[in-house]
Regions:
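Conserved beta-strand in the GNAT
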Residues: 56, 62-70, 77-82, 193-215
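C-terminal "cap" of GNAT-fold acetyltransferases
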Residues: 110, 117-119, 139-163, 246-247, ...
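Conserved acetyl-CoA-binding loop-helix of GNAT-fold acetyltransferases
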Residues: 83, 89-102, 125-129, 222-235
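A short beta-loop-alpha structural element at the N-terminal edge
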Residues: 4-20, 152-167
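Conserved GNAT acetyl-CoA-binding A-motif
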Residues: 104-115, 235-247
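Active-site rim helix/loop that mediates acceptor-substrate recognition in acyltransferases
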Residues: 30-68, 167-193
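Conserved active-site alpha-helix within GNAT-family acetyltransferase domains
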Residues: 90, 94, 106, 118-136, ...
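Amide-forming acyltransferase catalytic core, primarily the GNAT-like/NAT-type
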Residues: 130-203
Length: 273
């Protein structure tokens, strides 16, 4: 196998094919990764995938690498990047990343984000060589126990779009892409509000229930509203977990509410274009 490697826009494939390619390219990765077509479509649509900017690299007619690019305004993000084992360690990672960066600059993007699993030393080294700089560490949590939920009427269900719009009015809020308001309201799930000041977004699917975001009005912070809401959610949704998208500085809140931090963590990284 020594054919030329060529790239094509991911728009040539459907979500089910892209899910298979992504799973195939992640073979032997640090953390086991699989995804089906339905989940691929739901997840990356919420993250604002750009199929025309996402790339598949082919060799001898077979997909060998895949980069998922998501975009909002003049900001893009490398949402997933995987290379088949037979092409790893041959310099293709740097070649493919340079192509993605050049294309981002050509379309006028100002910033490019990504996340990398802590412990993926080769991936981290590659991104740092390409100019990406660590911004923060992202962590995840899961509930370790729960008590009987008693309906008191304090926690009310609302339209997720209402919560997203509330977050968008906070000009000082800077969240990871996965927790941003623009992502949250597009996911299947529910939103809740406590005392008209504390909000939570719960994403649901047949496999798990996940707390995707907790938000408290700036004027109500430091008064225990977040802790009360997260405790109520813990009771109502046994086994509740979060995505690995929580800024590390929020860990004390979750740990104090009966959650355990997951072993997998990520660095959020930024390249200014």
């Amino acid at each position: 196998m020594n054919g030329t490697v060529i790239s094509k826009a991911a728009a040539h494939w459907n979500s089910y094919q892209l899910a298979d390619i992504l799973t195939h390219c992640f073979e032997g990765y640090l953390v086991s990764f699989t995804i089906d077509g339905e989940t691929f479509a739901t997840r990356f649509a919420a993250e604002d995938i750009s199929l025309n900017d996402s790339r598949i690299w082919m060799q001898d007619g077979e997909p060998k690498a895949l980069a998922i690019i998501t975009r909002r305004g003049q900001t893009s993000r490398l949402a997933a990047f995987a290379i088949r084992p037979e092409l790893r360690g041959l310099g293709f990672g740097k070649q493919f990343m340079q192509q993605l960066i050049d294309e981002a600059r050509a379309r006028g993007d100002r910033n490019m984000w990504l996340e990398v699993i802590v412990g993926n030393d080769s991936g981290l080294a590659l991104y740092e060589r390409m100019g990406f700089v660590r911004q923060q560490t992202l962590v995840g949590f899961h509930a370790t126990s729960s008590t009987l939920f008693t309906e008191t009427g304090d926690m009310l269900e609302i339209d997720p779009l209402v919560m997203a719009r509330k977050m968008m009015t906070d000009s000082r809020l800077r969240l990871p892409w996965l927790s941003a308001a623009e992502t949250l309201y597009k996911l299947p799930g529910k939103a809740f509000v406590l005392n008209d000041v504390a909000y939570a977004m719960i994403a649901t699917n047949p496999q798990f229930t996940r707390l995707r975001m907790l938000y408290v009005d700036p004027a109500a912070r430091g008064k225990g509203q977040a802790k009360k809401l997260i405790t109520l959610l813990h009771e109502r949704f046994p086994g509740l977990s979060t995505a690995t998208a929580i800024p590390e500085q929020m860990a004390p809140l979750y740990l104090s509410c009966g959650y355990r931090q997951d072993p997998v963590t990520q660095y959020e990284m930024l390249l200014k274009l």
